[in-house]
């Protein structure tokens, strides 16, 4: 379970998050939505333990993330940051294993190699395994980064705008794979993802956390929380949720 209790974050005296309290259990996809500057990335980094709250607590499976040591945090969450930076000379295989090997001084163990093989299989990366990152398309590269996060074998995947540079086809491919990984089974993970595309949130999210100006607007199951009225208030423009061909679609009104 992820639990935030009265969490506020300030930067240079300016409030970024203001008195956020919410909780949700494992399973499914939780989408963080809201306008630019709402505090979504800061909230995700606070959950990962990389941003310490000015006040309040963040707990993941009972662990106080601000007080925990990095190895303790790494057993609970894997964060894929928006500006993830690694050398372009890495191969896909090396990238996927990078998050595991870094925990024990770069020396892979048999369990690490097995996990990398599983990740390459699950994300259909075997044909690209020995290719360098600078030889990949944007969609292939992002799929490799998500596989790297999955291979860290944590119950929670925290993804900061992983679709931002992708065309609709590659974005849909990533989300289809994430959706499949949240279903029960040995590969199951729980996903918390920052999304700007409301249509993607409407289609894939099980839960919605909506932020505006650093404050929590609503949090809950998508079918209850993601309403046209809430979206219009959140973004300051007329939006509605319509059912089209069996899917919820966000449309302007």
Model-derived features: positions:
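Conserved ABC ATPase signature
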Residues: 132-136
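Conserved ABC ATPase "signature" region
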Residues: 97, 110-128, 153
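Conserved structural motif at the start of ABC-family nucleotide-binding domains
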Residues: 2, 17-19
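Helix-to-loop junction immediately C-terminal to a conserved catalytic motif
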Residues: 48
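The feature captures the beta-strand-to-loop junction immediately N-terminal to the Walker
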Residues: 33-35
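Conserved ABC transporter NBD signature motif
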Residues: 56-64, 73
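Catalytic Walker B motif of ABC-type/P-loop ATPase nucleotide-binding domains
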Residues: 157-161, 166
